Curated annotation (Swiss-Prot):
<dbReference type="GO" id="GO:0033818">
    <property type="term" value="F:beta-ketoacyl-acyl-carrier-protein synthase III activity"/>
</dbReference>
<dbReference type="InterPro" id="IPR013747">
    <property type="entry name" value="ACP_syn_III_C"/>
</dbReference>
<feature type="active site">
    <location>
        <position position="280"/>
    </location>
</feature>
<feature type="active site">
    <location>
        <position position="250"/>
    </location>
</feature>
<dbReference type="InterPro" id="IPR016039">
    <property type="entry name" value="Thiolase-like"/>
</dbReference>
<keyword id="KW-0443">Lipid metabolism</keyword>
<keyword id="KW-0276">Fatty acid metabolism</keyword>
<keyword id="KW-0444">Lipid biosynthesis</keyword>
<feature type="active site">
    <location>
        <position position="112"/>
    </location>
</feature>
<dbReference type="Pfam" id="PF08541">
    <property type="entry name" value="ACP_syn_III_C"/>
</dbReference>
<comment type="function">
    <text>Catalyzes the condensation reaction of fatty acid synthesis by the addition to an acyl acceptor of two carbons from malonyl-ACP. Catalyzes the first condensation reaction which initiates fatty acid synthesis and may therefore play a role in governing the total rate of fatty acid production. Possesses both acetoacetyl-ACP synthase and acetyl transacylase activities. Its substrate specificity determines the biosynthesis of branched-chain and/or straight-chain of fatty acids.</text>
</comment>
<dbReference type="GO" id="GO:0006633">
    <property type="term" value="P:fatty acid biosynthetic process"/>
</dbReference>
<dbReference type="InterPro" id="IPR013751">
    <property type="entry name" value="ACP_syn_III_N"/>
</dbReference>
<dbReference type="GO" id="GO:0005737">
    <property type="term" value="C:cytoplasm"/>
</dbReference>
<dbReference type="InterPro" id="IPR004655">
    <property type="entry name" value="FabH"/>
</dbReference>
<keyword id="KW-0963">Cytoplasm</keyword>
<comment type="subunit">
    <text>Homodimer.</text>
</comment>
Length: 325
């Protein structure tokens, strides 16, 4: 089986909308400061819903869109940096919530590039013939790991989830992937878990599990790899950039996307943008965007799409997709 198709999409965001004006009551900021630097106008924040809750709701919508039964899914991969717990995995919790009792399940952490890594991994499993139908979810409740006193980070992120169902098919819907990592930049975007504390160690106290970021370094890295990754994946696909109908970037910052578009010689009309409504939802941004495009009827049969992401690790990745629905 060499052909894999996306047969359905779904997404879910919490009901609570937090505007830039709301953020100005928490930290020293303003709508003008946030929107001019990031393009973000508002974000969704979870109230008593955890990462698996958002992921399961997005998954159920993708299942409905695919017109399949949960029991037909035999693989679930969840991309997340904000799991409910160290164990069990979010994927196992999602499996139970949606009734996909026949699926093997695991989580994958590649930060904001996680969904691309997960989608590529799932497609490779299907191409080997080991699995037939996979659910790939990007889901985050980043609000629980934000430093709400750091205006440089807390204004950027939001909570949300997106999902796709992929299956072996007659047409090749996942044409090519290009993935990369650079651990030397690990401290540029960082969220510690816990110190090594046990009866035999000298370590005292817990690490602060909050996101920290070197914005200047992340910006430079993001523009660089976004441009190089898009060029490489298109070239490796045997296509030209003119063949691409849409580029769906990780929705982190409008300035990053604008700089990359200029370096690629492309109009911003080529890029699908929804970060103004959701902020940076890390591993959820790309599947959330794909589902929104699907629901709006923007994706016509045969359309070619490049998805491109970048994030902590450092990690980056891009894929060329063909819409076959």
């Amino acid at each position: 089986m060499n052909s894999v198709e996306i047969i359905g999409t779904g997404s879910y965001v919490p009901e609570k909308i937090v505007t830039n004006e709301d953020m100005s009551k928490i930290v020293d900021t303003s709508d003008e400061w946030i929107s001019s630097r990031t393009g973000i106008k508002e974000r969704r924040i979870s109230i008593n819903e955890n990462t698996s809750d958002l992921g399961a709701k997005a998954a159920l919508r993708a299942i409905e869109d695919s017109n399949i039964k949960p029991e037909e899914i035999d693989l679930i991969i969840v991309a997340t940096t904000s799991p409910d717990s160290y164990t069990p995995s979010v994927a196992c919790i999602v499996q139970e919530k949606i009734g996909a009792k026949n699926a093997a399940c695991f989580d994958l952490n590649a930060a904001c590039t996680g969904f691309i890594f997960a989608l590529n991994t799932a497609s490779q499993f299907i191409k080997t013939g080991e699995y037939k139908t996979a659910l790939v979810v990007g889901t985050e409740v980043l609000s629980k790991i934000l430093d709400w006193q750091d205006r440089g980070t807390c204004v950027l992120f939001g909570d949300g989830a997106g999902a796709v169902i992929i299956r072996g098919g007659d047409e090749n819907g996942i044409i090519k992937a290009c993935l990369g990592s650079d651990g030397t930049g690990k401290d540029f975007l960082h969220c510690p878990a816990t110190n090594v504390i046990n009866p035999f160690s000298d370590e005292k106290g817990l690490a602060s599990s909050k996101i920290s970021m070197n914005g200047r370094e992340v910006f430079k890295f993001a523009v660089k790899v976004m441009v190089s990754s898009v060029k490489k994946v298109i070239e490796d696909s045997g296509l030209n950039i003119e063949d691409i109908d849409y580029i769906v970037p990780h929705q982190a910052n409008i300035r990053i996307i604008e700089f990359a578009a200029k370096k690629l010689g492309l109009s911003m009309d080529k890029f699908f943008i929804n970060l103004q409504n959701y902020g940076n939802t890390s591993g959820a941004t790309i599947p959330l965007a794909i589902d929104e495009m699907n629901k709006k009827g923007l994706l016509k049969r045969g359309a070619k799409i490049v998805v491109v992401g970048f994030g902590g690790g450092l990690t980056w990745g891009s894929m060329v997709l063909k819409w076959t629905k």
